[in-house]
Design a protein with these regions (language model features):
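Helix-to-loop junctions at the C-terminal end of transmembrane segments
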Residues: 57-70
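Helix-loop-helix hairpin linking two adjacent transmembrane segments in secondary transporters
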Residues: 142-188
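Residue-level signature of mid-helix packing/kink "hotspots" within the transmembrane helices
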Residues: 23, 51-59, 147
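C-terminal ends and interior cores of transmembrane alpha-helices
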Residues: 79-94
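Intracellular juxtamembrane helix-capping segments at the cytosolic ends
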Residues: 32, 113-127, 134-135
């Protein structure tokens, strides 16, 4: 069996683990509203914006993955999503609701779409003999992310505060996603995906 294809799968799972943290947004809404004085409903709008831009960017990102390769689109996803979380921290720090919507909603949402689409078709291409397993691996990280991110974020908020937590998570997402993106690539023409190391 190919060691390379499992490395690609791990990279894809890591990408999805990072962007899947979007589903832990509810952990942040209360603390953000409390710290800034914004209405809870105003804070939750950021999530809706992010999901909207996830869908919008995913719609056109698939073609870019095919044209430019998953390494580039994964890198773009890392830069956008990591920056979006960092901008979220800045938005809370300076108490700017529009910046929250732009940072988390637009920038982060675009990163979500790029990060979601990037590994799916790539992992499936490496596992032509196990398409069901490949699909499961491709989206597994996205599903597990909220379960992992929620407790980590709660502990960080309790330990170092809300804004530093956003900066720590944004930096971690950026670095982990950048690293993961570098191992993701399409199989080369004629490459035996079951035996290549």
């Amino acid at each position: 069996m190919s060691k390379r294809r499992y490395l690609v799968a791990i990279g894809g799972i890591l990408l999805h683990l990072m962007i899947g943290s979007v589903y832990a947004w509810s952990v942040f809404t209360g603390p953000i509203a409390k710290q800034t004085g914004w209405a809870l409903s105003s804070v939750t709008v950021a999530f809706s914006i992010a999901i909207f831009f996830l869908g919008m960017s995913a719609a056109f990102m698939g073609r870019l993955v095919e044209r430019f390769g998953p390494r580039l689109t994964g890198t773009v996803a890392a830069l956008l999503y990591g920056s979006g979380i960092l901008l979220t921290g800045l938005a809370v720090q300076v108490e700017s609701l529009p910046l929250l919507y732009i940072g988390y909603g637009v920038v982060g949402g675009l990163g979500l779409g790029a990060g979601y689409v990037t590994p799916v078709s790539t992992i499936i291409a490496w596992f032509p003999d196990k398409r069901g397993l490949a699909t499961g691996m491709a989206i597994m990280g996205f599903g597990f992310a909220a379960m992992l991110t929620g407790p980590i974020a709660q502990n960080l908020i309790a330990g170092i505060g809300l804004v530093p937590t956003m900066y720590v998570l944004g930096t971690a997402y950026l670095l982990i996603m950048l690293t993961a993106a570098q191992v993701i690539r399409k199989p080369r023409p004629g490459e035996d995906r079951k035996s290549v190391v």
